Curated annotation (Swiss-Prot):
UniProt cofactor note: Reduced FMN (FMNH(2)).
Domain of life: Bacteria
Name used for this protein in its record: Chorismate synthase
Assembly notes: Homotetramer.
Taxonomic lineage: Bacteria, Bacillati, Bacillota, Bacilli, Bacillales
Function: This reaction introduces a second double bond into the aromatic ring system.
Cofactor: FMNH2
Keyword Heme: no
Catalyzed chemical reaction(s): 5-O-(1-carboxyvinyl)-3-phosphoshikimate = chorismate + phosphate
Annotated metabolic or biological route of this protein: Metabolic intermediate biosynthesis; chorismate biosynthesis; chorismate from D-erythrose 4-phosphate and phosphoenolpyruvate: step 7/7
Residues that bind FMN: R132, S133, S134, N253, A254, G298, K313, P314, I315, P316, T317, R339
Family: Belongs to the chorismate synthase family.
Amino acid sequence: MRYLTAGESHGPQLTTIIEGAPAQLELVADDINVDLARRQGGHGRGRRMQIEKDQVQIVGGIRHGKTTGAPIALVVENKDWKHWTKIMGAEPLTGDEEKEIKRKITRPRPGHADLNGAIKYGHRDMRNVLERSSARETTVRVAAGAVAKKILRTFGIEVGSHVLEIGGVKAEKTSYDQLSNLKELAEASPVRCLDKEAEQEMIAAIDQAKENGDSIGGVVEVIVEGVPIGLGSHVHYDRKLDAKIAAAVMSINAFKGVEFGIGFEAASKPGSEVHDEIAWDEERGYYRKSNNLGGFEGGMTNGMPIVVRGVMKPIPTLYKPLQSVDIATKEPFAASIERSDSCAVPAAAVVAEAVVAWEVANALLERFGADQVEEIEKNIREFNEKARLF
């Protein structure tokens, strides 16, 4: 599968087109809307979330609740567009209209795409950069991810996420009985944290950052359960599934690091404490006695849950802006201010779910065929039995 997105933060709509989804997949708008709503939640979101109440429109590829095998086209309208029709319109402006519009954005924000994008594409008004580089684009990435999650769920694979850290406050209690339990606990928390004590400290840290005109980042974790052995490949660098997932997580706005399993902790441990011992029983087949490697060996899934974490830096738009330089005058100024969040880590966990789900679903379809659901289900069932007895 593949998808493309189009649209700007304050344009009329955001669009994604998905190609390669199997036919006969049961899919309705509510399957997608539930994740769009989850993306908009979380303590620390800005005023924009009070304006936008995201709902998807399915405009192609689905008929009477089932995919047809044709490209799936999804649209999410921007409710705030009515206030931006002249500023963000596609048609040229008259001289009088140009005077009505607010000044060009010429003061880049440190940590954002503004200056680099303006230089790369020759934009004297950096709104052309920030509109597309905005995290608003993740709305339709979450929509695409919701389709991927429905594919995975159809074949018994579940995806969940939670927050491990915000603003230096770390969750200590992160244990859960099963993934459904983790998802329930995360959804009940305003910061998607399983540790109730840490949750309150995280909320306080977010409130303090907002009061200070500042922002804070954190760490999210995504878990995928029910994955067959052998998704991805060891034979070439660009077929390793953990590498694809790492790239996908790093593609999320403001993410600066990724790890699997115990991750960077492995650097300080001997191999005997890192590698997961192999066992077999008649019911499960092959399994690992631990999951330090986060479900991957040699770029391939090993049947254990995929466990991946991503680090999100603080959002670069600050209400107490850092110093910058005006590209029109070359004079020092405080950076431009756009409406923003003080913390988007809980929402970023939902985005991370989406991009991880996409890569896993893509690898699943690549391995087991992609034309129609019934064939894929048969292929997975036969392979799992073969792997159990191997």
